[in-house]
């Protein structure tokens, strides 16, 4: 049976369309994008192609684009770069596989005359100028001499190479500075050093020669005068073997960094015609004088007086040849191959008078460099690679594909992007569009820098010079790519593999669908179209129109008792560990704006929500405030301000408080509830004054504690009225009564409010309590009847227990006798949403079943009680909860029976847990005070960083606790602190986190430096997680479950988890596969469970003072000693963190550190051995 020929085979197609009968197989002695470019032209000429590659390049794209590919050397025989410099091995491969032509590309051996000679001697065709021409023009010194013979101007320089620093110095003495030392061979900016007056000529010479030797195998250099701010113009030349030379016009290569081209333009935009003509004429003249053959480039500098100077001839193809091809229509690589095979320019139709340019073209080199880090090359795996395209866009790529490994061994270029248009501006705009379309993830790229460059006015005008980048620091004020998709997928992938990492979460959300948004009705019972109906004006508009004082008068004049809804802040702090996220507040915000339009305010910001947003929810609290303000423009917002502490746990410099309050006011806060946790009026005044300066509404607040009607109590009616008197003297728009624990009983409330009202009839009184004992509604009714103007409530499903009293219950209890501004119907409508939120956040619920009248004894604040329970469980004291509550009472009395509000309530809680963990009675604490390592918060309190408690500090306990550790402050803490240098802080943050740092970020950092830094790192890793629906923030999607994530208006990600790969035992990672907007994506995640091994730590001997143990469970965040160091008693050994509590572990004895058992980030249990001290 006759064999049937495969007419569709590539071999058959080539045979039928063969052009070069004497040369049909080409080897490219290079790597990356240039072999691919050459292979493409070779395929068009029906040639077979051969690639070479190093072991490190075995996965590179150029190997796959050739018909055949052969490795250079055995693994480890050559370095990654040396492999491409093995002349004899490359030639042997070519001969062994019947190669007829060798193209050197650019770089590596492209300008090596020995390589060219050996190829010619072997009988193969060298695609490039002959070896003797390379010697003549490749040596820049020889090229300068050639220019002199042709009367082509050159920059003043040495007649030949220089061999010593002394010769370089002689040239400087004759011509002056600045000068440039240049490698005689090679290019690409390597082996070049500019030396200005005052700089070391010796160092520059040594670096230039060393770099040239490394890059090109030849360290020969010469020196010439350096022109300041010239243009770099190069002319593309083509010459055949018969003496014919043409030019393909010029390229403007002035945009450079360290003498390496970054962006190129063809033709030059601003070059005068006469200068262009002179340069083109001189370029052709030089090529003919050198008997040049094949493709090459003559390079010139043009000074600011439009005088041109010849620099060199590059005897090879250039990286930027693509844009000349775009404007002339000439395939330069195909011409190279055919000329080398014997074709004349005339045969190729390349006649000078027939060649013209059409429009403009621009080329950008997209590299894996980080411009923000001085263009430091980035390495790693490309996770996502989506390129540009379309009209006027050309891509010449190398290793740009998803999954490519970017190694540190080679050039960092991924792809060359060239755009063309009928004029310069069109080409520029196409380039901007093309760069914006690129999506490259997994490695840093220079695209943000290129975009900044392309939009700079100097580039727009085409007037750049060779040092433009170095002279223009504003180019580095880049808009970074957000990389939102890949970051979000990284979080979901980690969630799929490792589960939720949100602290405090137990189990999964019980709500597994989107919550329903309720229908809101107006006073006539009609449905309100909340999407298309703007919220009605209310108290906030009055505030904006008339200011804080008239606003206060309007509130006082209201006939009834208004309600502030705390659902958005204190309610979820008290019930759900402050874990409610921004997205769930925003979902109900439009409905709330209508339903609660006559509410006094929404408490939505400040207090614990501020740091928890960053610390645990990975959200920006300022972003939350701005978004909520936009969604609810009509209802006043109130925040909680801890006086001189801001929203921190101890005092800050006064200017930090002023700065914070101003940012909060500008971002949308209207009313500031200002309090001091000890009712220290000096501390309180700092916050009050800051609010006044910012133009906010001041609600100066008295913190209520205990039972004022109980005989002998420290805080009685007389105390509270005297405190109110001083606050009124200070000046406030509203007066707040803040009952954090819910110990304000109805009778006490009636007496307190009526007493204040009698004395101050015109000031609005605003009461806050917690319903821990179950008596909150009764207390509020008493307050309303006694003359209170505002009370704090939460919607039904978010009320009670440690939260605020029920809004609906309060409204119903008043039985319409007192107007609250909110109807029961609207309260129920909003509550329907929050009842579903309780299910969504059920994994943060505290195990509280009902009211706890015991609060009248232990006085634990409502917002703290659930968090304290959670903390106790985290540090191993969950089974000792009753002991902890009892210890809280005892700790309070040890501290002097203080007012307990954040942060002083935290001090009591930390001390209580410390006592239970270390089995200490109050007498033990007093007896051992000078020896114990107390939590930092306790030390802060006794030092005086939180102010001075009413009645002073307990002595001698204070003295003993601080002995050898802290000093005693004798005046307000803020006066002891140096003002923050806010400008310097912002600059430092910008240097670390980029130019996107705002004044609000500075304020966050001032409050919580470590928390802010950690948040920015999470944000850098995962992006903006606030857009992720909560059920997918806390629990992974099911396989093949489609989820939608709206990242901004009109832009939605559609995501589906397709598979989770097996564990890689070598790396301890798994690959998670997603379908993202219909495309497959893969994310590699460390399997943290797979890497976990059971570690049994030795325990410290409690009876041996030389063995230091952990006083409680936590994480080691800092180790301050190492074996062999001398320590004294009380010297810090390490810092332990348990939830929000930090503790310095100090040495119990003096001696030498013998062994340190722990390291940073180690988890330890109570009693675990930290280190040993030897005498």
From Swiss-Prot:
Cofactor dependence: biotin; Zn(2+)
Pathway(s) the chain acts in: Carbohydrate biosynthesis; gluconeogenesis
EC number: 6.4.1.1
GO CC annotations on file: cytoplasm
Keyword Zinc assigned: yes
Binding site for substrate: 569-573, 642, 902
Domain of life: Eukaryota
Subcellular localization: Cytoplasm
Start and end residues of each Biotin carboxylation domain: 22-474
Keyword entries, A-Z: ATP-binding, Biotin, Cytoplasm, Gluconeogenesis, Ligase, Metal-binding, Multifunctional enzyme, Nucleotide-binding, Zinc
Catalytic activity: hydrogencarbonate + pyruvate + ATP = oxaloacetate + ADP + phosphate + H(+)
Protein purpose: Pyruvate carboxylase catalyzes a 2-step reaction, involving the ATP-dependent carboxylation of the covalently attached biotin in the first step and the transfer of the carboxyl group to pyruvate in the second.
Residues modified to N6-biotinyllysine: 1140
Protein known as: Pyruvate carboxylase
Principal location listed in the UniProt entry: cytoplasm
């Amino acid at each position: 049976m006759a064999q049937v020929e495969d007419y569709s085979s590539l071999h058959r197609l080539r045979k039928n369309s063969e052009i070069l009968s004497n040369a049909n197989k080409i080897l490219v002695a290079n790597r990356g994008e240039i072999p691919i470019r050459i292979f493409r032209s070779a395929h068009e000429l029906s040639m077979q192609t051969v690639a070479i590659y190093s072991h490190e390049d075995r996965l590179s794209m150029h190997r796959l684009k050739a018909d055949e590919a052969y490795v250079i050397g055995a693994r480890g025989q050559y370095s990654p770069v040396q492999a491409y410099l093995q002349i004899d091995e490359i030639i042997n491969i070519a001969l062994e596989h019947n190669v007829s032509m060798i193209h050197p590309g650019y770089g590596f051996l492209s300008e090596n005359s020995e390589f060219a000679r050996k190829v010619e001697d072997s009988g193969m065709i060298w695609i490039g100028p002959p070896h003797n021409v390379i010697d003549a023009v490749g040596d820049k010194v020889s090229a300068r001499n050639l220019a002199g013979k042709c009367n082509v101007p050159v920059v003043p320089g040495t007649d030949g190479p220089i061999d010593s620093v002394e010769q370089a110095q002689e040239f400087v003495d004759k011509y002056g500075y600045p000068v440039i030392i240049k490698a005689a061979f090679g290019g690409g900016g390597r082996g070049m050093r500019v030396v200005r007056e005052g700089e070391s000529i010796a160092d520059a010479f040594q670096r230039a020669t060393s770099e040239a030797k490394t890059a090109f195998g030849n360290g020969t250099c010469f020196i010439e005068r350096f022109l300041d701010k010239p243009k770099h113009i190069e002319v593309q030349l083509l010459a055949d073997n018969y003496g014919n030379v043409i030019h393909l016009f010029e390229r403007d290569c002035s945009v450079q960094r360290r003498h390496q081209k970054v962006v190129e333009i063809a033709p030059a935009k601003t070059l005068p015609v006469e200068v262009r003509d002179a340069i083109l004429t001189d370029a052709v003249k030089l090529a003919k004088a050198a008997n040049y053959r094949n493709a090459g480039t003559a390079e010139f500098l043009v000074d600011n007086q439009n005088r041109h100077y010849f620099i060199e001839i590059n005897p090879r193809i250039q990286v930027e040849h693509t844009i000349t091809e775009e404007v002339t229509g000439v395939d330069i690589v195909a011409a190279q191959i055919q000329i080398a095979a014997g074709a004349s320019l005339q045969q190729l139709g390349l006649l000078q008078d027939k060649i013209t340019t059409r429009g403009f073209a621009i080329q950008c080199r997209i590299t894996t460099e980080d411009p923000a880090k001085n263009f430091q090359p980035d390495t790693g795996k490309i996770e996502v690679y989506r390129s540009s395209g379309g009209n006027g866009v050309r891509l010449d790529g190398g290793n740009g594909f998803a999954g490519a490994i970017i190694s540190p061994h080679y050039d960092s270029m991924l792809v060359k992007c060239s755009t063309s248009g009928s004029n310069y501006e069109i080409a520029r705009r196409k380039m901007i569009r093309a760069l914006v379309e690129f999506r490259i993830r997994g490695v840093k790229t220079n695209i943000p820098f290129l975009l900044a460059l392309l939009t700079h006015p100097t580039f727009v005008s085409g007037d750049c010079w060779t040092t433009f980048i170095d002279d223009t620091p504003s180019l580095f004020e880049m808009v970074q790519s957000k990389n939102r998709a890949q970051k979000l997928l990284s979080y979901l992938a980690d969630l799929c593999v490792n589960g939720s990492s949100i602290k405090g979460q137990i189990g999964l959300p019980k709500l597994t669908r989107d919550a329903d948004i309720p229908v809101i009705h107006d006073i006539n019972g009609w449905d309100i179209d909340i999407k298309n109906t703007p919220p009605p004006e209310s108290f906030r508009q009055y505030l904006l129109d008339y200011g804080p004082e008239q606003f206060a008068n309007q509130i006082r004049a209201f006939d009834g008792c208004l309600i502030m809804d705390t659902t958005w802040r204190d309610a979820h702090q008290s019930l759900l560990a402050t874990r409610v996220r921004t997205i769930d507040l925003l979902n109900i915000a439009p409905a709330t704006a209508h339903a609660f339009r006559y509410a006094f305010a929404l408490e939505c910001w400040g207090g614990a929500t501020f740091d928890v947003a960053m610390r645990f929810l990975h959200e920006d609290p300022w972003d939350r405030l701005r978004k909520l303000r936009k969604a609810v423009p009509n209802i006043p917002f109130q925040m909680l301000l801890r006086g001189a502490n801001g929203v921190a746990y101890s005092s800050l410099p006064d200017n930090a408080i002023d700065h914070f309050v101003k940012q909060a006011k500008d971002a949308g806060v209207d009313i500031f509830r200002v309090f001091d946790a000890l009712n220290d009026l000096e501390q309180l005044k700092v916050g009050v004054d800051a609010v006044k300066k910012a133009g906010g509404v001041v609600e100066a607040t008295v913190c209520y504690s205990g039972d004022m009607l109980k005989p002998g109590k420290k805080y009685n009616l007389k105390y509270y009225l005297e405190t109110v008197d001083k606050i009124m003297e200070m000046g406030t728009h509203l007066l707040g009564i803040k009952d954090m624990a819910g110990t304000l009983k109805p009778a006490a409330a009636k007496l307190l409010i009526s007493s204040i009202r009698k004395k101050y009839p015109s000031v609005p009184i605003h009461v806050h309590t917690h319903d821990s004992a179950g008596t909150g509604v009764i207390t509020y009714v008493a307050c309303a009847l006694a003359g209170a103007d505002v009370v704090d409530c939460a919607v039904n499903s978010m009320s009670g227990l440690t939260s605020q009293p029920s809004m609906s219950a309060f409204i119903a209890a008043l039985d319409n006798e007192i107007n609250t501004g909110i109807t029961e119907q609207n309260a129920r409508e909003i509550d329907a949403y929050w009842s579903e939120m309780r299910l969504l956040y059920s994994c943060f619920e505290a195990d509280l079943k009902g009211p706890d009248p015991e609060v009248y004894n232990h006085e634990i604040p409502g917002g703290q009680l659930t968090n304290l329970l959670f903390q106790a469980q985290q540090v191993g004291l969950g089974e000792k909860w009753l002991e902890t509550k009892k210890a809280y009472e005892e700790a309070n009395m040890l501290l002097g029976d203080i007012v307990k509000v954040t942060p002083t309530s935290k001090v009591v809680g930390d001390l209580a847990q410390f006592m239970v963990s270390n089995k200490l009675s109050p007498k033990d604490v007093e007896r051992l005070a000078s020896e114990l390592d107390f939590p930092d918060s306790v030390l802060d309190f006794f030092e005086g960083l939180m102010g001075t408690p009413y009645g002073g500090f307990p002595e001698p306990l204070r003295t003993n606790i601080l002995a050898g550790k802290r000093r005693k402050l004798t005046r307000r803490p803020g006066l002891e602190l140096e003002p923050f240098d806010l400008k310097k802080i912002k600059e430092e943050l910008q240097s670390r986190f980029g130019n996107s740092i705002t004044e609000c970020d500075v304020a966050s950092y001032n409050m919580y430096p470590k928390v802010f830094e950690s948040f920015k790192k999470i944000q850098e890793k995962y992006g903006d997680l606030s857009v992720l629906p909560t059920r997918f923030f806390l629990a992974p999607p099911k396989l093949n479950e489609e989820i939608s994530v709206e990242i901004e208006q009109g832009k939605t990600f559609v995501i589906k988890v397709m598979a989770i790969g097996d564990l890689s035992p070598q790396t301890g990672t798994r690959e998670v596969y997603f379908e993202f907007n219909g495309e497959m994506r893969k994310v590699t995640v460390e399997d943290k469970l797979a890497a976990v091994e059971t570690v049994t730590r030795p325990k410290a001997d409690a009876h041996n003072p030389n063995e230091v143990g952990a006083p409680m469970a936590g994480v080691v965040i800092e180790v301050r000693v190492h074996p062999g160091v001398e320590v004294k008693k009380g010297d810090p050994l390490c810092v332990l963190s348990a939830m929000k509590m930090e503790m310095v572990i100090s040495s119990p004895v003096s001696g030498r550190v013998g062994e340190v058992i722990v390291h940073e980030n180690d988890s330890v249990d109570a009693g675990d051995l930290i280190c040993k001290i030897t005498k």
